[in-house]
């Protein structure tokens, strides 16, 4: 069973226990709306019930196709940007390579990066592509897919199309193109915004190809769904309440801080989830990320003594991820006081010291998980999606649209001569 808890440390006298509890109570109405799922957002709530896109029949379909691919594949190139790759990439980077390597493409317009991609592919024997796009007008995955199709045609000849799986919206131009070309197809859920697709084929299929336990992910998400939908003693409500209280007090930036470097990509997923969902109508917190202990040497001074615009949310892993004990080489280097200590212990002391110092300036929100595995990631994905929905209702914005992101795209397409 997965474990997740929420608490806060505050030695800045910002929160009083009574004030926080009163605000949580005020927000119960928002919780109840999110627990039910609002009718006006029905066309966006395909993620709200985990079984809708991660039920038994769907899991069998993902696993069956993944098993077919795994018989020959040594490398899966996942083409996608933003919500089309962030969740899968978060799990892959955190838990490490399993059986099949995943290479991520279609997330940059850098010629240098594209050349490096093809140099890397020259080292691989049997390559498959999973192109993921809800709206196939997005430039990065579109041109990457074309470039990689050309590469596969040269490498495999007439049978190149058997190496391509697409996850597209059904009955669109791109879906029909895929069927005409003989590509294998999976549906991109039409009723889920891209950043909420962590428990759908968008994320689960490539992870299944790579050898991850997607049933454990589903199990963790289902447990979290049951917990959040059936309790008012609710960590998602507590987190949403705390962060919106801080926003209302004048804070403008939420910094998600971790002491485990392999969670870097999860931070990127979180940043898109909250940035696109909450940042509209002149409202919302700017989501940023910090990777400790390294970033303590760049951001620590600002957080301790700079503009009071920032607060922190810590994502903390309770059980050590790994172990490495510091030995001795007999040299007096000034570090004998930590001889024999485990790096995990030292890292945890740094975490506790950071909380102690930073919480004297602002409240530190703390989300604690027991360990890093597929079940925990399923739980985390659902928790943050649910909490984000609550936060957006409290803030007074529609969580599921992102019209603002089209502004730069429209200018870019015009400059490139798109008709």
Q: Where would I find each of the regions flagged by the language model?
A:
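Flexible loop/turn segments at secondary-structure boundaries
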Residues: 84-87, 111-113, 137-139, 172-175, ...
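A short, well-structured juxtamembrane/interface segment
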Residues: 53-70, 234-247
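Generic C-terminus detector
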Residues: 378-419
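Helicase-primase coupling helices
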Residues: 288-373
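Short helix-loop-beta junction
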Residues: 91-101, 151-154, 273-284, 357-361
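Active-site phosphate/pyrophosphate-binding segments
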Residues: 156-312, 402-419
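Extended, charge-enriched "interface" segments that sit outside catalytic cores
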Residues: 1-67, 329-337
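Glycine-rich phosphate-binding loops that contact phosphosugars or nucleotide phosphates
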Residues: 67-229, 410, 414
């Amino acid at each position: 069973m997965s474990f997740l808890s929420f608490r806060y440390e505050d030695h800045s006298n910002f929160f009083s226990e009574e004030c926080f509890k009163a605000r949580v109570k005020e927000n119960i109405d928002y919780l109840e709306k999110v627990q039910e799922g609002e009718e006006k957002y029905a066309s966006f709530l395909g993620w709200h019930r985990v079984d809708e896109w991660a039920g038994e029949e769907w899991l069998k379909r993902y696993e069956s196709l993944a098993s077919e691919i795994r018989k020959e594949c040594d490398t899966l190139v996942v083409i996608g940007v933003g919500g089309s790759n962030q969740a899968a990439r978060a799990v892959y980077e955190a838990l490490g390579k399993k059986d099949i390597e995943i290479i991520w493409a279609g997330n940059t317009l850098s010629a240098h990066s594209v050349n490096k991609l093809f140099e890397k592919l020259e080292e691989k024997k049997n390559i498959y592509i999973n192109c993921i796009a809800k709206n196939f007008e997005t430039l990065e995955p579109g041109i990457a897919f074309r470039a990689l199709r050309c590469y596969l045609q040269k490498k495999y000849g007439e049978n190149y199309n058997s190496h391509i799986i697409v996850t597209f919206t059904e009955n669109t131009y791109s879906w029909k193109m895929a069927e005409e070309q003989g590509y294998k197809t999976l549906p991109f859920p039409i009723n889920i915004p891209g950043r909420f697709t962590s428990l759908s084929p968008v994320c689960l299929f490539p992870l299944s190809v790579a050898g991850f336990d997607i049933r454990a992910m589903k199990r963790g998400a289902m447990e979290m769904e049951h917990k959040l939908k059936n309790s008012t003693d609710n960590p998602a409500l507590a987190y949403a309440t705390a962060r919106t209280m801080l926003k209302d007090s004048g804070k403008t930036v939420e910094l998600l801080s971790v002491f485990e470097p392999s969670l870097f990509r999860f931070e990127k997923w979180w940043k898109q989830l909250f940035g696109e969902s909450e940042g509209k109508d002149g409202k919302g917190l700017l989501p940023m990320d910090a990777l400790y202990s390294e970033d303590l040497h760049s951001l620590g001074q600002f957080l301790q003594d700079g503009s009071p615009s920032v607060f922190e949310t810590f994502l903390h892993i309770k059980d050590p991820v790994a172990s490495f004990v510091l030995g001795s080489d007999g040299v007096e280097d000034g570090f004998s006081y930590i001889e024999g200590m485990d790096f995990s212990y030292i890292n945890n002391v740094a975490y506790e010291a950071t909380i102690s110092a930073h919480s004297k300036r602002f409240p530190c929100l703390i989300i604690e998980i027991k360990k890093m595995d597929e079940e925990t990631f399923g739980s985390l994905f659902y928790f943050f999606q649910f909490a984000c929905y609550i936060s957006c209702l409290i803030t007074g914005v529609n969580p599921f649209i992102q019209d603002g992101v089209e502004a730069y795209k429209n200018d870019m397409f015009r400059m490139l001569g798109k008709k």
